[in-house]
Design a protein with these regions (language model features):
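C-terminal output helix
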Residues: 105-114
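Active-site residues of response regulator receiver
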Residues: 52
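Two-component/phosphorelay signaling modules centered on CheY-like receiver
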Residues: 10-29
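The feature encodes the CheY-like receiver
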Residues: 56, 70
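Helix N-cap/capping motif at the beta->alpha junctions
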Residues: 17, 30-39, 60
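As written
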Residues: 60, 92-98
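Conserved acidic carboxylate
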Residues: 7
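Hydrophobic/aromatic residues positioned on beta-strands within the core alpha/beta folds
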Residues: 79-80
Length: 121
């Protein structure tokens, strides 16, 4: 399984890197900016894209707005956010992202999320 994490929080990035390192069947790429994430999404195929909504300069919202709804639906994009603003969350649901994943989260919740999007063989 190939995962892209686009997250500017270094603690979350490190946890994800360690987590994926323990899972031999997960190839996890971690980038710390929306712009770099956008480039990776355009140039590589991922089974799951975990995208932080609030990042400086080029945010997760900017990344989402770079794609059409149909493109996002095909890409399995899940938003990572600590936001509890119902308006923002509702707008994100209407963009084609698969779901909103609230921070903070447990490793158990992360495992459940990853398994949900694992390609079926």
């Amino acid at each position: 399984m190939k995962i892209l994490l686009v997250e500017d929080n270094l603690e979350i990035s490190e946890v994800m890197t360690v987590y994926c390192g323990l899972k031999k069947d997960i190839d996890c790429k971690v980038v710390n900016s929306g712009q770099e994430g956008l480039e990776r999404i355009r140039n590589e195929n991922f089974d799951l894209i975990l995208l932080d909504l609030a990042m400086p300069e080029f945010s997760g919202k900017d990344v989402i707005q770079s794609f059409t709804r149909d493109q996002l639906v095909q890409k399995n994009v899940v938003i990572f956010t600590a936001s509890s603003d119902p308006g923002v969350l509702e707008r994100m649901k209407n963009t084609g992202v698969k779901e909103i994943f609230k921070k903070p989260f447990s490793l158990e919740q992360l495992t459940e999320l990853i398994e949900k999007y694992r390609p079926r063989q």
